């Protein structure tokens, strides 16, 4: 379902987004 797709997308993007968030904090 949609949530499964969103979950996999979030898992894929998290490693790229986390360092950016860490830099801003």
Swiss-Prot record:
Tissues where the protein occurs: Expressed by the skin dorsal glands.
Gene Ontology terms: cellular component: extracellular region
PTM text: Caerin-1.7.1 does not have any antibacterial activity.
A biological process term (GO) from this entry: defense response to bacterium
Subcellular location: Secreted
Modified residues (Leucine amide): 25
Disulfide linkage: none
Pfam families: Caerin_1 (PF07440)
Keywords on record: Amidation, Amphibian defense peptide, Antibiotic, Antimicrobial, Secreted
InterPro entries, per database record: Caerin_1
Family stated for the protein in its record: Belongs to the frog skin active peptide (FSAP) family. Caerin subfamily.
Known function: Antibacterial peptide, that adopts an alpha helical conformation which can disrupt bacterial membranes. Each caerin displays a different antimicrobial specificity.
Domain remark text: Contains two amphipathic alpha helix regions separated by a region of less-defined helicity and greater flexibility.
Protein name (database record): Caerin-1.7
Annotated organism of origin: Ranoidea xanthomera
